[in-house]
């Protein structure tokens, strides 16, 4: 028995780190959620890695302009020396005959250092000029990725805030119906209401509770989606601290009304793409001009009939040379011209894409502005309408309580109130989404 208890305690202690980790709680404003995502979202992480990859690629290009130094060494054992036929008369022999002579030694060793230095290569120098733009190109991609994640977090975060408001309205309606049911039962007990009136209220209560259950489930799923966007463990708990008001929906939009293409990160990105295409054209043009390089080597060579290279006193012979290499392209079968033309066509494609993006941006800004204006107007109307529906419901309820109103009237007022609340919730969500889309379209998000 003691062993069983000890085993349970061991299991509990083993699970404590897991339980603790599962109960991590994060209270987050919208900005804190965005900052968390910038550090933990996988897409942002990979975009940042692309910047580092480009930095290493730039180092590789830079390295080609530095001296290239290498050491080499070899050792050869000549198992069979080559034999040459030499006229015998060279050695006092019979004219017209030949002697077989083996030339060489059994062992050869060579060691040395080689240096190559690029002095001028237009293609390499163009690559060096493009390094900064290439880094900025990848950094701009990081900004675009962050902006996309930021926009999605805006929408999901405020969707959850709006859903909380929706849940509060459902709870308020449940309280109203419970009180109305209680009052109706009292009236029924006193003979002023029918059992059917109570049954109708029970149906409405069941429907509202079902709606609440669905809303709670949707909110839970929304939190899961927010965690995925932020790169947060699913087991962690998130508590949203920001609220939503009409003033927040209007705040910052006036500044966004002043718009410039250069404020859009995707427009900046495609501009950099055009510049990189220009570097391509320049690089291929440079392939038609001469290249100049310097090479040098210094070697030591030794020859032995016995393997005694490491003994002192043996002779080693120095070999050294310096070479200036000039390569002048004369004819490449029109391949260079074809590469230049292809690069120019690709650059024109990028320019065309930039012009197409301008049209797309114009459309996005105008549509987003129209949607925002309409959404804010609808929000104002629906807020007033919800207040009016609440007033109508309260007045109808009072009439019902004093016996001058019917159950049909109060059911209608309840239905109208619920419809007005639903319309307000939808208008509130549509307004904040329209604001996010407008800020993103104008490059102000």
Name every feature range the model reports, one short phrase each:
Residues 1-2, 56, 146-261, 371, ...:
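Periplasmic alpha-helical coiled-coil/stalk elements that build and connect Gram-negative outer-membrane
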Residues 1-31, 41, 425, 431, ...:
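Bacterial Sec-dependent N-terminal signal peptides
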Residues 22-74, 80, 234, 240-278, ...:
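Bacterial Sec-pathway N-terminal export signals of envelope proteins
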Residues 24-25, 72-113, 243-251, 295-328:
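Small/polar, glycine/serine/threonine/aspartate-rich low-complexity segments that form flexible
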Residues 33, 40, 47, 117, ...:
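Amphipathic alpha-helical coiled-coil segments and their boundaries
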Residues 45-49, 62, 119-146, 196, ...:
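Sec/SRP-type N-terminal targeting helices
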Residues 210-232, 387-444:
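Short segments within alpha-helical structural elements
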